[in-house]
């Protein structure tokens, strides 16, 4: 088998594993998994084995054939007789993964790239001495920076002294004329320096370019006779000389403070438990919310979950009761958001990543969505708000809550609205929810 075949086989195995994960989420037994271990059923593959050729059994001896004695145990019940169907389940095993691996597998399956951000600072450590300040102990002085700044200033202020001195030998030129000419030539020389040189001229420089008693009739003649020596050439020939160091250029090194932030998350799961939420709807909620819990547990360092049930009132429940509880009252979704807002006061948004997931069949009391729920969703700071409408295909869709929320928030990057009508919709709903979150706030 070549490299190409190996690669294709690898992709086939990976794709089959992702399909197994999707089938488990949509149709598998979620109750067999716990908060710290997800048990995904996998199909067993028969290992290669030698078998007798069914067409080469050999012959029999002479005479009548008598039936032989049965060897081994008789067939177990459940395998079926003749054309009857058996009642044994297919061979399978479970692959147990932790939430981190589950999150990675789901990311790969859905093509997600959620990178949660830490918020709460739990520790500070000193890193390398890469930061600088204007003040500090003399022992931490960054002399290289100080010298470099001085050298830059030296180069910026440098000029060819012999060239300027030569301008003083132009016929009829004095200090003012030379200074005006130097300014026009962008030569960084002061009038005081020119005046001092005029009082005590230097007949030549190290290069011997200016000769004694040389006088030019015009500045053009001087410029034609004397070449300007570049600063780089002078420094290479005689060194930089005295470099001016100034206190304003002093910088002192200190270690960079590295903040270690803990990635904390609190997830508020809200479910309508009113009389209209029959078992088929509750199952769709469980198949959507449970993988989200596993996913966020795997993504964050510390995950806490709050479960709120509501009809016309709202109350906190344990996770074990959350998906099975049912009441006979009406529906007022805002009561759940009011309770969620109070609960989240204990989880400051500056320190916690916050998710608020709600689910129901879309039914709500008159005007409660517009007057109460939508304002509350605006007031509750969260990485992501999501509403999952569960409407099995065998029922009449009468709820309007999801549509009103969708209209109110539009394409807002922290509000997701999705509808689940059957298990096949669950993976799409999860993808819609997780891909809606703006990764900058995660």
Swiss-Prot record:
Region (Disordered): 55-91
Similarity comment: Belongs to the UPF0229 family.
Alphabetical list of SUPFAM superfamilies matching this protein: vWA-like
Listed name of the protein: UPF0229 protein VNG_0746C
Species classification: Archaea, Methanobacteriati, Methanobacteriota, Stenosarchaea group, Halobacteria
Biased composition (Acidic residues): 72-88
Domain of life from the UniProt record: Archaea
Pfam annotation, one family: DUF444
InterPro entries for the chain: UPF0229, vWFA_dom_sf
